[in-house]
Amino acid sequence: MGRVEDQIKDNYNSLSHEGERLNREAKIESEKLKNNAKLDAKDMKKDIDESVHSSWETVKEGAKTVQDYISSGIESVKHTITTEPAQKDMENLKHNVNHNLEEAEKEGSSVLNNISNFFKGSAEEAKSEAERIGYEAYKDGDQFVGDVHKNFKRTANETQKDANRLTSDVKNESNKIYKDIKDESNKLYNDVKGESSKIYNGAKKEGSKLATDLKKDTQYVADETKKMAADLKNKAADTYQDLSHDASKKATQLKKKASETLDESADAIEHQFDIMKKDFRHLNQRNGMIWGSIGLIGGATATSYLFPSASPMAKFTFIAGLASLGGYYGLHQPHNKIVDNAFHKANNKKEELKKKI
């Protein structure tokens, strides 16, 4: 019987380790997504900085040509052309993107920690209840423990398979979400880069053309420069709105997937509780027959030795009473009540967790 009890404890220990493994894999996936996003953002900023620097250097060269044509009002024109109007907008865009990434990281960590705590807490409570049930059966010396152990071992294997499948599903979904975000970010980045190139190339051409007759068109140059700066600012604002909307959409998908995974896990736990209840119901039925027989034999023996002169009806009543009492005692062992309490605790925790997701 000691070997059976040890095996029951080992099986539940493996379930607890499985929950810890799920937590480690979730953290690895989260770190991978965060690091890749930061690398992409860094590359995007580097490319934009290089494009801006190169384009504005060309415009500055055009400004030198302007100085050869006019002397009056040159400081105003020079300031208008050589100041980088998009620099502040790019800094704002970088700040907003970094803030958005930090918020997504905090929210994702909270969801993953809640799921991890649910798995770990459920495994520990189930382990405690199983050890209690196993000890009760071991103390009674019931041979039925062998059958219960076989069913429990099969149940533990099925639970581990379900956990592995759910882990694979979450991992695949995480990879898919990251790929979608990366593809969408690359598309938006290419749009910004292409639009920036068009704006700065236009500035270069316009600057060279207007430099030849700047004496007449000084105000026009200033207006065109302001217009190009406004175009770039609007494009940056539109890009940030698209990124923000896409991030919110992906966060909603992640929450939905987390909720579905939680429901599937809770259903699997409920299924295992149902199997245990069925096994213990059979055990109670058999105990009822055994204790009923004990009551019947005990009643017959007692009436033969203690009440030899009693009437047949009195003897029959006494024997039937002991048999009924024994049967009732056997049928109402508290196994399923223990299982029900454990299930209700796990279900209540699941509902609390769903409110936090």
Curated annotation (Swiss-Prot):
<feature type="coiled-coil region">
    <location>
        <begin position="150"/>
        <end position="177"/>
    </location>
</feature>
<feature type="region of interest" description="Disordered">
    <location>
        <begin position="1"/>
        <end position="29"/>
    </location>
</feature>
<feature type="glycosylation site" description="N-linked (GlcNAc...) asparagine">
    <location>
        <position position="114"/>
    </location>
</feature>
<keyword id="KW-0812">Transmembrane</keyword>
<keyword id="KW-0325">Glycoprotein</keyword>
<feature type="glycosylation site" description="N-linked (GlcNAc...) asparagine">
    <location>
        <position position="172"/>
    </location>
</feature>
<keyword id="KW-0472">Membrane</keyword>
<protein>
    <recommendedName>
        <fullName>SrfA-induced gene J protein</fullName>
    </recommendedName>
</protein>
<feature type="compositionally biased region" description="Basic and acidic residues">
    <location>
        <begin position="17"/>
        <end position="29"/>
    </location>
</feature>
<dbReference type="GO" id="GO:0006972">
    <property type="term" value="P:hyperosmotic response"/>
</dbReference>
<dbReference type="GO" id="GO:0016020">
    <property type="term" value="C:membrane"/>
</dbReference>
<feature type="coiled-coil region">
    <location>
        <begin position="223"/>
        <end position="270"/>
    </location>
</feature>
<feature type="transmembrane region" description="Helical">
    <location>
        <begin position="290"/>
        <end position="307"/>
    </location>
</feature>
<keyword id="KW-1133">Transmembrane helix</keyword>
<keyword id="KW-0175">Coiled coil</keyword>
<feature type="coiled-coil region">
    <location>
        <begin position="5"/>
        <end position="51"/>
    </location>
</feature>
<feature type="glycosylation site" description="N-linked (GlcNAc...) asparagine">
    <location>
        <position position="157"/>
    </location>
</feature>
